[in-house]
Amino acid sequence: MASTVEGGDTALLPEFPGGPLDAYRARASFSWKELALFTEGEDMLRFKKTIFSALENDPLFARSPGADLSLEKYRELNFLRCRRIFEYDFLSVEDMFKSPLKVLTLIQCLGMYDSSLAAKYLIHSLVFGSAIYSSGSERHLTYIQKIFRMEIFGCFALTELSHGSNTKAIRTTAHYDPATEEFIIHSPDFEAAKFWVGNMGKTATHAVVFAKLYVPGDQCHGLHPFIVQIRDSKTLLPMPGVMVGDIGKKLGQNGLDNGFAMFHKVRVPRQSLLNRMGDVTPEGTYVSSFKDVRQHFGATLGSLSWSRVSIVSLAILNLKLAVAIALRFSATRRQFGPTEEEEIPVLEYPMQQWRLLPYLAAIYALDHFSKSLFLDLMELQQGLASGDRSARQAELGREIHALASASKPLASWTTQQGIQECREACGGHGYLAMNRLGVLRDDNDPNCTYEGDNNILLQQTSNYLLGLLAHQVQDGACFRSPLKSVDFLDAYPGILDQKFEVSSVADCLDSAVALAAYKWLVCYLLRETYQKLNQEKRSGSSDFEARNKCQVSHGRPLALAFVELTVVQRFHEHVHQPCVPPSLRAVLGRLSALYALWSLSRHAALLYRGGYFSGEQAGEVLESAVLALCSQLKDDAVALVDVIAPPDFILDSPIGRADGELYKNLWGAILQESKALERASWWPEFSVNKPVIGSLKSKL
């Protein structure tokens, strides 16, 4: 391993080209190669290099600077590229189970090239595929083979035109006909059309369609998933009774064809029901493998968490790209200085450090969290596949649902805010489309909305926590969960007695300080939210009204504080484990502390309101600690970016290239733009067709 770290394996981690970034790279307190190996592992680094090299050397993936593709051409190109990924077969189904994190790595690599490509591949292979795998049974395994041979192309159809977040109001129906042993899939009207479904617009042949299941006697058993063929696999023409189309151009991710579908009494075989959670006999009797409704609900929620957990990873990859661009720019862009003769890199300014370095720390913390949560989800899926119907399995589903529901908002919002900060931190050059920050901002934007509106998802998490507290108050139950994310709440009366007692900045430079504060904050917000909820109910509000009245100032911050605590806790434990190389402990500790304290600082008002903070000193120490950590990480920033940044071809930003030749790269890219030096094709409109001043002025 040592020879690899020191450059013995130059093919795996080649040296960066010399240039203006050399000075910062020389100042780093650690070896970026050693950190890359510790963070990813040699096998994963080789996997990433294989993917990136294949894309860079394949003409189908060639970049076209300045090209404005038509919507139709972009969709075609994205599909061809998605098909090529299957031809490369970077990751077999067997490998997915042997090394689950390679799934996330593949998605991140594709997303770094183009978010539309990652989304298209993800929806077909992981979201559609995992829905069948986790919700279906042996009779559906043939679909898995067809998915990875690309004999069919899939999508996940839950949302409707008039309902998205409120899944209980979904109106597509599936009535069982025992005479023919078929389900009749039907959209009662256009408002019940499946809508916003990725891959459905032009390419999907099959959909996992969620519909309300009815058995004879009009007894409804709630939402269930069905495999429904929507297009002929040979002609891509709609199947009988299916109206399917594309919803049009979006603000971003336009390589992905989002679509709609209506079903007019479409008959599908009884076996089309994905029946792991519930089934219908040939005679029309509904049977469920879960006797307890709560267990059934928890398992169902967990099986639907795939896309939300994946979105966390998709969001973080966008932040990786944006921060890599902005920090390399900041290390080479010189403006002003202590004398008129000397200009210094803008990264030397505390303001630039404060704007960007917390997002660099967020990348490391959230990336680790997304991987750990993905592995937790794999554990849940394996339990479902093995037929585990234990109470622990159901509770694991509820806990993962709560964590996924809050981590998607945290990751997507952090990324959206971070990309905007990066865009502004790069000044006017950041506004040039060729530097990619605008594209990243638009492509990340839907992460805040699809698979659940962020603010509504946070209510799922706060409801989970409130339910645990109610169970404890009413039944004396302990706070316990399979992943131990809530176990600390058992000590909440004692935690609420604690105060912030750190008096110096030096004592604050550890994520353990923020961990203690976060535990107090979650306990405080949980108690306050619970009391507020009960107060509203005693005042005559219904449960629905009471929860809505509590959400803005109580439930929302509770959910965010809880997931931030979980991220901080996991990253803190990760960087303080004994296996961390001594040469990496300091920089990883600073990243952990910076993310924790920076995140905590946004809750300062609540910490004061609840009495954990008192006096001016607490807030001042927190602010000063964040600035001190930014200053300490400033010289490591470029090396930390080198660990997370993809090759220049993938990054695709003249101002973010690894050689640091900011102006040469930008000038060259501008001169290569199509028609950059040509006069406008409409030049006669100025030179020949002069305006007759006042000719259109009203004579009245």
UniProtKB/Swiss-Prot annotation:
A cellular component annotation (GO) from this entry: peroxisome
The species this protein was found in: Pongo abelii
Top-level taxonomic group: Eukaryota
Keyword Chloroplast: no
One GO BP: fatty acid beta-oxidation using acyl-CoA oxidase
Intervals of motif Microbody targeting signal: 698-700
Name by which UniProt lists this protein: Peroxisomal acyl-coenzyme A oxidase 3
Function: Oxidizes the CoA-esters of 2-methyl-branched fatty acids.
Secretion signal, residue range per the UniProt entry: none
